[in-house]
Amino acid sequence: MELSVIALLLLGFVNFSWQNEQAPRVKTSLGDIRGYYKISRHGRKYEAYEGIPYAQPPVGNLRFKPPQPVQEWINELPAVEKGPVCTQYVVLSTPQNGDKVTGCEDCLYMNIYVPFRNGNESLLPVMFWIHGGAYQFGSGNKVNETLVMDRDVILVTFNYRLASFGFLSTGDSVVPGNMGLKDQNVALRWVHNHIRSFGGDPNQITIFGLSAGASSVHYHYLSRLSAGLFQRGISISGVALAPWAQTKYAPEKARRYAATLGCPTRNTKEMIDCLQTRPARILSQATGEVPDIYAPFGPVVDKYGPDPFITRSPIDIIVSGEAYDVPWISGVVSEEGLYISAAFVGNDQLLKQLNDDWDNIAPYLLDYNDTLPLNQHKEVAEKIRKYYLGSNPIDSNTSLSVTHMIGDRMFSVDFQKAAILKAKINKSPVWTYYYSYRSMHSCSEIVSGGSTKNFGVSHGDDAFLVLDTRISNVSRPNDLEMQQILLDFYTSFAIEGKPRAGDVQWQTLDPNEKEFQYLHIANPQNIKMETSNDSANINFWNTIDFNENKISGQE
């Protein structure tokens, strides 16, 4: 006990000393930046530069416009406090003050964390994190960087515009869309251009993200704007082919959205001029008027703008061979569907409601309301239910099957398709994984409103174990070991160009094999390569002709 107290006192003294010594400073072509020192999870000193603007504030006439380059500053920039989060409607929880709207429009800021170099001139690999949140919520500010700072990599986190501010599209040149993805691109370009000033290697940038951030990573492989700005990527539970990652009927949704705000909808310029006058808070509150469980506003084909992010559908870009050809890792967890189902699987009343009204709820729950004709909705709902549940009712005994149904449809099927296509068409290696380790805490606790019941391994449980403050401060030995395995996985890929997980030889995906190959991370003592000829029940889902990911000319 005495040794522990002494260690804590020494750590506090070191921390106090570092905070009071001369602050770290860097010089960039935009101006000087001053940061501050912090301590990593296991006691390493590192530099923190928080709240760095990477684009002009998208306010006033710049609302709904592509991001504009940040201007030079004259005085030293104090980068000692994170910038505000982007305006968003809080979906998964209610803040203590009860206000569901948070953030502001002036939010395009990044945070850069750099291991203390102590005179070492070697450039460090860079990891560029893209946060998730269905393109509607979230922030790079929520990342807990302290564990990553135990390794010799630079970590960059940032905010990008969300919901209507980042993804409204009129389907023409007025607001082509994808402002949020363009924010990401400008942030990535900023890092590519300036990270050398922080001791980072602009030719060793790994982009990685979770959920919508994972699909964003995939989108950067498909955009000519981002080609050359990074050397590898990791998509954690999300790809651009996922149904929620491609917005259907975006112009119609924009008009419906504008109508709820009392704006004219016949002329898109007049409509946007009107939306420009509405307070950000009102715009954020109105997002709930656009019916979509997953992402009412998200990525679109924006070929009408002067600097389009993508001019064709993701599938067309992929099969044409035009995607950026650099290494990629992609994977899923065993109960991806908990992203949605955790809100109801522990509630018998909600399960009964889902059971009784399945035919009407299924098209929205499984996101095919816009991709199948109305006269097929009931037939497909019954077909899916029969496959996963047989003749059983939806209740606590079958809730896991419902979770797997949602996860297969929304994440796992298209993850597999995207990985195989990239491995088949491009030359760079592709690695895939399947994560089924349940730690003491889970993201399902957030979605379920605090329930600690074990519903399975939730969407986000892998990345959050390393990067999120809400569940990353773990104490169980197996959880701590898994943290290190995942940290090795992410950082070894950034440093060496090949991922490492435990002592297993992680093989690349061979698209010519009949069975899908992946690394199964079951627990710290059980990590191995596996294969499947029907992963995510993909053969069943291929029998349903959704109007999704159709190659042009083959509709």
Swiss-Prot record:
Q: How does activity depend on pH?
A: Optimum pH is 8.5.
Q: List the disulfide bonds.
A: 86-107, 263-274
Q: How is the polypeptide modified once translated? A: N-glycosylated.
Regarding tissue, the record states:
Expressed in several tissues, including epidermis (at protein level), fat body (at protein level), gut (at protein level), muscle (at protein level), and venom gland (at protein level).
Q: Which PROSITE patterns match?
A: CARBOXYLESTERASE_B_1
Q: Where is the active site?
A: 211, 336, 459
Cell location: Secreted
User: Which top EC class is given?
Assistant: hydrolase
Q: What is its EC number?
A: 3.1.1.1
Question: What's one GO BP annotation on this UniProt entry?
Answer: lipid catabolic process
Q: Which residues are tagged as glycosylated in the record?
A: 120, 144, 369, 397, 473, 533
Q: How does activity depend on temperature?
A: Optimum temperature is 40 degrees Celsius.
The job of this chain, per UniProt, is described as:
Lipolytic agent that may be involved in distributing the venom via degradation of blood triglycerides. The recombinant protein degrades triglycerides and exhibits high lipolytic activity toward long-chain triglycerides (tested on tributyrin, trioctanoin and triolein). Does not affect mammalian cells.
Protein name, as recorded: Carboxylic ester hydrolase
What organism, scientifically named, is this protein from? Answer: Bombus ignitus
Upper classification of the organism: Eukaryota, Metazoa, Ecdysozoa, Arthropoda, Hexapoda
